[in-house]
Each structure stands twice: as structure tokens, then as C-alpha cells.
Curated annotation (Swiss-Prot):
GO cellular component, as recorded: chylomicron; extracellular vesicle; high-density lipoprotein particle; low-density lipoprotein particle; very-low-density lipoprotein particle
Localization: Secreted
Methionine sulfoxide carried by residues: 109, 193
GO biological process: acylglycerol homeostasis; cholesterol efflux; cholesterol metabolic process; lipoprotein metabolic process; phospholipid efflux
Pfam families with a match to the protein in the record: Apolipoprotein
Post-translational modification: Glycosylated. Palmitoylated.
Function, as annotated: Participates in the reverse transport of cholesterol from tissues to the liver for excretion by promoting cholesterol efflux from tissues and by acting as a cofactor for the lecithin cholesterol acyltransferase (LCAT). As part of the SPAP complex, activates spermatozoa motility.
Keyword set, alphabetical order: Cholesterol metabolism, Glycoprotein, HDL, Lipid metabolism, Lipid transport, Lipoprotein, Oxidation, Palmitate, Phosphoprotein, Repeat, Secreted, Signal, Steroid metabolism, Sterol metabolism, Transport
GO terms assigned for molecular function: cholesterol transfer activity; phosphatidylcholine-sterol O-acyltransferase activator activity; phospholipid binding; protein homodimerization activity
Name of protein: Apolipoprotein A-I
Residues making up the signal peptide according to the UniProt record: 1-18
Residues covered by region (10 X approximate tandem repeats): 67-264
Length: 264
């Protein structure tokens, strides 16, 4: 269980919260990401499954067995859509409680991130300024060459390209130097952030908060399982008529084949 909690901590650090921290966009909750992916996946499965069922029904085997699977497909799709909706509410409730219980952990880690960001920001600003200066210097050197191209003849194009080559290489070389400088500065703070994270997780492992959360997590899982059980039972009951219809069609077809064989 401790490993689960530590993994969750890293998830929140490197997932939507960290993305929001660096990119400053609106964070998407972990549950929203899971739900969006699951919805997309199920929709694709339903659509492709319906096409496959239609092909199977139209096949010689499907006609001989009188499967009529396509007639039951809407029933199946409706049952699974209902299951997804009902489990969605239960899962959302579970996830909301989980995020509430781990808010203290995310808050502490965000504080650590903010400290590191303040140290790193000057280097990012400096890198941006240097790159702007390099681009400005490059444009200043290229501008006279552009005038030559505009005023010169077509045969001068090759000469212009030869002049632009070294300038482009010069800009690239300077950019790489600045990137190396930035990478060197950031490496120190990346290691510092890793050490802070390790210390933070170590402190959490030794604190009573972890034991309390283990108890809460177990309670949440039991509650989720209890609420999901009747929903899954409803799905099973809803699929019974489809299964019985399928079994009946198979049995009738088998009886007809047996009768045909014995009469010959």
C-alpha cells in the first residue's frame, strides 16, 4: 500500500498538476483524463463491433445459425452505456474523495515546485533574451543580403545562398551554446528537485498521515466495490435475455442439423 501511495504522489507531480505548473494552462483532473480515454475507447469498440456483427450476420454461417446478432447489438450497446454512466457517477464520487484526501500531499509538493521555479526562472529569462538577441543579430546581417537579392539579377541567387549558409550555421552554433548553458544550470535544480521529492516522500512514509491514508483508501475501495456490485449485477441481468436467445438459436440450428442427418 505504501508503494501505491508513493506512486500516486509521483503521478500528481508529473501529471496534470506539473503540466499546469509549467505550461500555466487549465489543469485537467486525472479522473477526467481517464474518463475521456475510456469513453473514446468504448465508442471505437462499439462502432467497430457493430460493423463486425453486421458482417457476421450477413455471412453464410450467420444465416445458417440464424444468429440475428445485429438485433441484439442495440440492447448490448444500451446496457454497456448504462453501465458506463452508472459507474461513472460512482467512480467520480470515489475520485473526488481520493483527491480531497490527497490535497495536502499535492499542496506540499506544489510548494516545493514553486521554490525551484523561482530559482530556475532567471535562467529561463536569460536564455530567452539571449536567443532574441541572436535572432536580431542574424536578421541584421541578413537584411543587406535580402536587398542584394531584390536589386540583383537572378544569377546572384546562388551567391546569396552561399552567403546565407555561414550565417545560418553561426546562428545554430550560438543557439546550441545557449542551450548547453541553460541545460547546465537546470541540471543542478533538477537534481535538487529530485532530492526534495525524495525527502518529502521519506517524511511522508515516516509520518502518521500515511497510516491514516491507508485506512481511508481501504474504506474508499470497499465503498466503491459495494456500490459497483449492484450495477454489475444489473448488467448481468440485462444481458441474460440476449444470451438465452443466442443459446436457443444455436440449439435449434443444431437440432435441425441432427434431424436432417438422421433422416438421410
Amino acid at each position: 500500500m505504501k508503494a501505491v501511495v508513493l506512486a500516486v504522489a509521483v503521478l500528481f507531480l508529473t501529471g496534470s498538476q506539473a503540466r499546469h505548473f509549467w505550461q500555466r494552462d487549465e489543469p485537467q483532473t486525472s479522473w477526467d483524463r481517464v474518463k475521456d480515454f475510456a469513453t473514446m475507447y468504448v465508442d471505437v469498440i462499439q462502432e467497430s463491433g457493430k460493423d463486425y456483427v453486421a458482417q457476421l450476420d450477413a455471412s453464410t454461417l450467420g444465416k445458417q445459425l440464424n444468429l440475428n446478432l445485429l438485433e441484439n447489438w442495440d440492447t448490448l450497446s444500451s446496457a454497456f452505456s448504462k453501465l458506463r454512466e452508472q459507474l461513472g457517477h460512482v467512480s467520480q464520487e470515489f475520485w473526488d474523495t481520493f483527491e480531497k484526501d490527497t490535497a495536502w500531499l499535492r499542496e506540499e509538493m506544489n510548494k516545493d515546485l514553486e521554490k525551484v521555479k523561482k530559482k530556475v526562472q532567471p535562467f529561463l529569462d536569460s536564455f530567452q533574451e539571449k536567443m532574441q538577441e541572436e535572432v536580431k543579430r542574424y536578421r541584421h546581417k541578413v537584411e543587406p543580403l535580402s536587398l542584394e537579392l531584390r536589386d540583383g539579377a537572378h544569377q546572384q541567387l546562388k551567391e546569396l545562398q552561399e552567403k546565407l549558409g555561414p550565417l545560418g550555421k553561426d546562428l545554430k552554433d550560438h543557439a546550441l551554446v545557449h542551450m548547453d548553458e541553460l541545460r547546465s544550470h537546470l541540471r543542478t535544480y533538477t537534481e535538487e528537485m529530485g532530492q526534495i521529492l525524495a525527502e518529502r516522500l521519506g517524511a511522508i512514509k515516516e509520518s502518521t498521515s500515511l497510516a491514516e491514508y491507508q485506512t481511508k483508501a481501504s474504506e474508499h475501495l470497499r465503498t466503491f466495490s459495494k456500490k459497483a456490485k449492484p450495477i454489475l449485477e444489473d448488467l448481468r441481468q440485462g444481458l441474460l435475455p440476449v444470451a438465452e436467445n443466442f443459446k436457443t438459436n444455436i440449439k435449434n440450428t443444431f437440432d435441425q442439423i441432427t434431424k436432417h442427418v438422421t433422416t438421410q
